[in-house]
Amino acid sequence: MRKYMRGVTLMELMIVVVVLGILTTVAYPSYRQHAARAKRTEAKAALLQIATMQERFYLQNNAYTTNMTSLGFAVAGNFMTDSNSYVISVTAADAATFNATAVYQKADAEAGKCATFAIDGRGVKTSAPSVDCWTNTRL
């Protein structure tokens, strides 16, 4: 009696490759959108933290500051978010108000919708080029 070798046929292999290709085509854009939203959330959280620290500094010193170490950060000037996507900085500060910004640093498709976030001493939140990046979580 003859024994047959068992294995994967070329047709089965091709079907697996096609199914994986379809799954990748569907899943990858969704993954990219999720990653972009996570980076934006990280930038917004950093700006809100700076706003909180600025208010604490103001209560103690009766003025705002551009020096990040005065706010409790390890660096005096700009710093990057943990994902290295946004540069966070306090661009202006005086006795009346401050302005903190987060600017996207990479040259890819994610930068198009929410490249810049800002918050000031009055709590006004702005973004560019899209004006609703702070409130719209689907961007």
Tell me the role of every PLM-derived stretch.
Residues 29, 55, 132:
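Glycine-centered loop/turn positions within well-structured domains
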Residues 59-139:
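Periplasmic/extracellular, small/polar-rich flexible segments of pilin-like filament-forming proteins
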Residues 4-5, 41, 127:
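Residue-level detector of intrinsically disordered/flexible regions characterized by low predicted structural confidence
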Residues 1-31:
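N-terminal single-pass transmembrane signal-anchor helix
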Residues 37-41, 49-70:
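Alpha-helix exit/C-cap motif
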Residues 19-21, 27-28, 57, 64, ...:
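Preference for short coil/turn "hinge" residues that link or interrupt alpha-helices
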